[in-house]
Amino acid sequence: MEPTRVEVAYCEGWDAAAHAAFRPLKEQTARERHSTGRRYAALLSIDAEPRALIQVDTGAGYVGVFSFDLAGRRSLKFSYRDLGDHLMLRELKAWRHVDDDEPEFGADLRITFRFWPDEPVRATLDDARRGQFTSYVKLPGPLHRIPLLEFGRWPVDGWLLGAFEPLEFVTAADPEREAEGPFWAPWSAPEGARPTALEALFVPGARIRNGQGDVFEVREPRAVGKLRLPTGRIVAADPATVELQGEQAVAPYTVTLTPGEYAMETARMRTAGRGTDMVAAARVRVSEEPVATWELALRPGQDERLLGASEFFGFVVDSGTAAFMDASAVDALAAYQDADDAEAAEATIPGDGVSELLTFPSGKGDGSYPVWIGRDAVGSVTCLVADMRLLGRGVEVDAPGSSARNAMATARQVPGIAQLEVHDVAGIEAFSSQGILEFFNDTADAQAEFWARRMGR
């Protein structure tokens, strides 16, 4: 059988309005970006019809694959993350259109599968009429792991492209010239949550404005006390529900401190014109050195590379109260909350010997909150900050006086240390869409039918 000819054109992305590649690139430009960690895209076409769009950002460890439907819309998306020795499918999303007139990404039914290593797949159906339905299903085998991406060897096959195999990839002619000048990028790799104005939260008199037009006035930080860390292993958790949260939820962070006592304080602010203070953050001070970098605090088994857009690994609060504590306090506190072990725990909580914890109000109440690690210019830990995420997006800061502005000079963010368990990837096979898409479609159809029966057609 004659191979199916697949033309590959390089570009910045896809222009849905023009139904064409956006800002075409020369092949050599794309190669250079691939090797230097800069983003680019590859448009795959058969007989001048787009069949797939590959988005690559090797610097961010991201590969996205869009498949086009017969109406020329991007209707299926694979999102992969580079875990060092293989690519892992993190998300698979489909837009199920009823007719050809529905706009791209405007389908009434959206289906999203989220993948984690060694955990069930979270399947979410978003129906514009019936609402949202989420369930968990077991993935039959490691269908979500594929080899690392090499330039020119794209994670597509005939099943995904709607073509007969074998496939023959042919590079399109280079554009005569590449567009120059600034432009609004049509896509970016998913990026986890970032710390927002953490330094400014502890500068009295600073004014912070967010993208919604809210203006916050920063108050004087309030000292909470000395946090005693006999083991140097620190935990952030809801002190009222430690016994219920499970080992992973209350595991100490992978960063360790020298055993000792550390000052803890809360950042307070109020909305301009109002008289009620809010706790915006809690900080454990390790040194007085300025923060040069921020990184997300991680527990064993957590890997920042798996986070989606604006996601974070946080600690959960169900009682409106949060706490920093030493790891040695967790078992004693859990025993205190367990009626069977209450008597045994009484000698330890509150106690004055081996453990201690300090509590603070958790922002607006229950939720999940990240902890950020601040490091100085030489990499030493200067503080840990529990962020109550009250500021929102589009933050601008105005601080009084040069000393205050220097104190809140914005530190850059760096990736946290990956804590994902090592997996045996020797058996990983080349990309094949059939197995994962059959699983996806069968599961989605079954759950959509179940949901329709339950909710009423």
Residue ranges of model-derived segments:
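Long terminal segments
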Residues: 1-34, 96-183
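A structural detector for short beta-strand units
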Residues: 36-43, 62-68, 111
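A short glycine-rich beta-turn/N-cap micro-motif
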Residues: 48-52, 71-76, 107-108, 118-121
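Beta-turn initiation residues at beta-strand->coil junctions
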Residues: 54-59, 66, 76-83, 124-128
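Short, surface-exposed coil-to-beta transition loops
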Residues: 61-65, 76, 88-91, 106-110, ...
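C-terminal structured interaction module
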Residues: 122, 129-134, 345-396
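Intrinsically disordered, low-structural-confidence terminal and linker regions
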Residues: 163, 168-223, 401-440, 453
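Extended, low-hydrophobicity segments enriched in charged/polar residues
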Residues: 181-334
